[in-house]
Structures are given as structure tokens and as C-alpha cells.
């Protein structure tokens, strides 16, 4: 018997949101500490606990599977390129040219950035697509309603970083949250097409 419950979904999100808001209020530690240690502890640990101990489901119920692996690669990389192109065009129109932040583009920097991006994508996609979206879809039997709600929650979880770390003005904040919401819709869409979390993780990276 499956033990999926809306209460579990809301409790998980509320816990992560409150703890993460408090964390973001304080000075930011190094990115690797946040993405490799703190975020997995706050986001992944309670998610895995819910799945294994409360729902008594395998982790494959989160989308950890080798099924439809190649379609997942196509969806994730293909839609990811579209999002990347959109971001590039936005940058060009905003600054009337290509405005890139000067960084130390060494192999070590590149590999470190990719590694942190993968860690971030793995954690966030496991929680929001693997758990929240998939459970809402199973409970409501409506993919798009589940997608919209999960994407709204995904945007909301990015509010603390926008307020406390990035210091966005209200107008910029709304634009930022809207873009995160749109990305959430795309990530849930590709995950729903494949049932493999690799698709949304690749899109996220």
C-alpha cells in the first residue's frame, strides 16, 4: 500500500523553506560548503527519510532509474540548450552586447563549477521533481496542476537567496522568480516525459 500524502509534501517543503530562510539570513559560507554539505543535509536527508521510512518506497520512486536514459539525455540537453540560448539572448538585449563576467576560466575552475552545478541540480531536482512534483501528480492525477504547484514552490524556495544574498529589488525579484518558475515548468515537463530524473538534472545543469 502506498502512503503518499499531501501532508508529507507540504511538511517537507515547509521544513526546507524555514530552515533555508534562516540559513540564508546569515553570512554565506563558501559555495562548496553550501552545495556539498549543508544543502544535502537540509534538503536530501528528510526527503530520503520520508521515502524510505514513512512511505516505505524505493528510491527509484524518485526517478533514480536507468530506464529511458537516452531519451532523458535528449530531453535534458536539448531543452537545456534552448534555456541557455534564451539566457544568452536576454544578456545581449539587456546590455546591447554580450556582457560576460570576467572569471578565471582555468580547467580547475571549469571542473569545479560543473561539479557544484551537478551537486546543486541533483539535490534540487531530487526534492522538487523527484519528490514534490511526482507525489502531487500521483495524488491529484493531473500532471499540469502538479507541475504548476511544484514550480511555484520551486520559485518560492529561491526567495531567500534573492532577498538575503543577491539583494534584488522588488521588480528584479519578480522577474527572477518568474524565470525560476518557468524553468520549473520545463524541468517537470521533461521529467514527466521520461520518468528519469537524469533529464531534469541535465536541464538544470
Language model segments and positions:
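Hydrophobic, membrane-facing alpha-helical anchors
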Residues: 1, 69, 101-103, 153-158
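N-terminal, membrane-interfacial amphipathic/helix-forming hydrophobic leader that caps
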Residues: 1-66, 87, 164
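Membrane-interface helix-boundary motifs at transmembrane edges
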Residues: 3, 32-33, 59-70, 133-142, ...
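Residue-level signature of transmembrane alpha-helical entry/exit and packing/kink sites
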Residues: 4-13, 32, 36, 40, ...
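Membrane-water interface at transmembrane helix exits
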Residues: 23-27, 51, 55, 59, ...
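Juxtamembrane helix-loop-helix connectors linking adjacent transmembrane helices
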Residues: 26-35, 58-123, 171-172
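Transmembrane helix-loop-helix hairpins at the membrane interface
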Residues: 109-205
Amino acid at each position: 500500500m502506498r502512503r503518499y500524502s499531501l501532508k508529507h509534501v507540504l511538511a517537507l517543503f515547509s521544513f526546507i523553506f524555514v530552515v533555508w530562510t534562516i540559513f540564508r539570513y546569515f553570512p554565506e559560507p563558501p559555495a562548496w560548503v553550501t552545495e556539498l554539505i549543508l544543502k544535502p543535509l537540509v534538503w536530501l536527508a528528510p526527503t530520503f527519510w520520508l521515502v524510505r521510512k514513512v512511505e516505505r518506497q524505493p528510491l527509484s520512486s524518485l526517478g533514480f532509474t536507468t530506464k529511458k536514459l537516452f531519451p532523458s539525455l535528449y530531453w535534458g540537453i536539448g531543452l537545456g540548450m534552448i534555456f541557455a540560448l534564451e539566457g544568452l539572448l536576454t544578456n545581449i538585449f539587456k546590455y546591447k552586447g554580450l556582457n560576460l563576467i570576467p572569471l578565471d576560466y582555468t580547467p580547475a575552475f571549469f571542473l569545479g563549477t560543473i561539479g557544484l552545478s551537478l551537486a546543486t541540480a541533483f539535490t534540487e531536482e531530487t526534492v522538487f521533481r523527484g519528490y514534490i512534483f511526482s507525489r502531487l501528480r500521483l495524488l491529484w492525477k493531473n500532471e499540469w496542476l502538479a507541475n504548476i504547484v511544484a514550480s511555484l514552490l520551486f520559485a518560492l524556495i529561491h526567495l531567500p537567496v534573492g532577498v538575503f544574498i543577491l539583494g534584488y529589488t522588488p521588480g528584479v525579484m519578480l522577474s527572477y522568480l518568474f524565470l525560476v518558475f518557468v524553468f520549473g515548468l520545463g524541468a517537470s515537463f521533461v521529467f514527466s516525459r521520461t520518468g528519469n530524473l537524469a533529464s531534469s538534472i541535465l536541464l538544470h545543469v
